[in-house]
């Protein structure tokens, strides 16, 4: 048996506090909205001191799926989180051009690759299959069991778990693709950043988008839909 004094000590031992998760949603939104209003007047010190770190934190949370540029409103529709679009646009304003190493030739861009600095452990944790030739940019969310064939997923996009992005398919900036969808070869899911209030292209769960189909910004493809390009 544990002596009484040890039991008392155990009861009184302070619990370890969880590590802080950083600024909350409201603080981030306020910072992003404020920076957006002053975007043409931001100083170097402001960008380095608060704007860029906050924008990068938002990008991290978009990548994790915690934040989405558009999300279900609980009434059968969708709502657009304009402040997240602002964050994506501010990302371009606050990042410097940099050399992106690649083979056979490097790139010169502001947006790094989603998988830059990944190793085997990080790929296994993410749970996404990435075929050679696939490109996903920083700030894109990829759910578990997503398969990326040689395709392109842009910044701010959301691709739900179990979805196949087939060869030469494109998921545009801030587009939202649901779970267990199939974007066939050459399909294009349009991207939209401006105007801010515009609804991104949305593909709901369990959809099949046929080869060479194009779904432009503002359209919502309902769940379990099957689209083929018009041949007439």
Where are these regions (language model features)?
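Terminal amphipathic alpha-helical/low-complexity segments used for targeting or macromolecular assembly
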Residues: 1-128
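Structural signal for interior beta-strand "rungs" in well-ordered beta-sheet cores
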Residues: 124, 128-232
């Amino acid at each position: 048996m544990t002596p009484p004094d040890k039991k008392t000590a155990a009861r009184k031992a302070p619990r370890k506090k969880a590590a802080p998760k950083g600024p909350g949603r409201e603080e981030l939104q306020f910072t992003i909205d404020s920076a957006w209003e002053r975007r043409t007047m931001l100083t170097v010190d402001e960008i380095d001191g608060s704007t860029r770190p906050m924008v990068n934190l938002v990008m991290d949370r978009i990548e994790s799926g915690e934040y989405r540029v558009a999300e279900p409103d609980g009434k059968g529709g969708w709502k657009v989180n304009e402040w997240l679009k602002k964050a994506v646009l501010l990302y371009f304003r606050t990042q410097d051009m940099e050399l992106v190493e690649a083979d056979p030739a490097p790139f010169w861009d502001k947006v790094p690759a989603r998988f830059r600095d990944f190793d085997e452990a990080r790929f296994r944790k993410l749970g996404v299959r990435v075929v050679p030739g696939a490109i996903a940019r920083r700030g894109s969310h990829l759910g578990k069991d997503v398969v990326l064939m040689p395709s392109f997923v842009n910044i701010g996009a959301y691709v739900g778990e179990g979805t196949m992005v087939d060869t030469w398919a494109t998921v545009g900036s801030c587009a939202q693709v649901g779970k267990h969808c199939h974007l066939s070869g050459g399909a294009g899911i349009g991207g939209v950043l401006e105007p801010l209030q515009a609804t991104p292209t949305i593909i709901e769960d369990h959809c099949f988008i046929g080869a060479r189909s194009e779904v432009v910004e503002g359209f919502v493809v309902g769940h379990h839909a099957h689209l083929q390009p018009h041949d007439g």
